[in-house]
Amino acid sequence: MIRTALLICVCASLAACAKPSTNSCEARADAMLDLSFGAFDQGPDGWRSLDGSLACPDSAPGVLAEYRHRHRDALSRPNISLLTWHEAQVRAAQGDDQRTAVRLMREAAFAGEPDWQRLYREGSIAFMEGDRSRLMAARDELAGLPRDPMLKGLNGSEVEWPPNLDVLDGLISCFGKPYSVAYVCRPAP
């Protein structure tokens, strides 16, 4: 009898460890919704911790959308654009409906966005739509842009110029492969 009770306890413990609780993912996501924009987007406890999590891999797109919705009155248009872009990237990388990812990529556009950002977006959309010539044209135009002296990194450091050229080069190198593969298919520095 003791042996049976012990076996039941061990099995129950193993079953609890086998799959993370949906509630724990929801609790993490709910806690993120109260973070500042900077902490939510770039911090170690923000949405990226869900995207890279083996426990909660499907939670990132939903929490990005919910954060945008809850904070829409306080967020600037560029910040809304950035969160929309990240949701599109996560959905594309997860292999979700590609039309949804492309729609979100297009929604990320805003009046007055920097040319480098627009070209990166256009090149990414061209990749998603299987249009290599549009991807190449966006890449070449991005490569020819003059440096933006106002663009700085998070800590005020210089930013690699032009931003995301390596990403478009990777999309070209791995054209036809899934976004999740092509996004990290970048030339060695």
Predicted regions located by residue number:
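Positively charged n-region of N-terminal signal peptides that target proteins for export
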Residues: M1-T4
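C-terminal motif of bacterial Sec signal peptides marking the signal peptidase cleavage site
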Residues: A15-A16
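N-terminal alpha-helical interaction modules that lie
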Residues: P20-E87, E141-P189
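Hydrophobic/aromatic side-chain positions at a characteristic register within alpha-helices
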Residues: G52-A55, A92-A93, F127-G130
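"A position-specific structural signal for the A-helix of alpha-solenoid helical repeats
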Residues: H86, V90, R121-M128
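Single-residue signature of alpha-solenoid repeat helices
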Residues: T100-A101
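TPR/TPR-like (Sel1-like) alpha-helical repeat modules
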Residues: M105-F110, G123, R132-M150
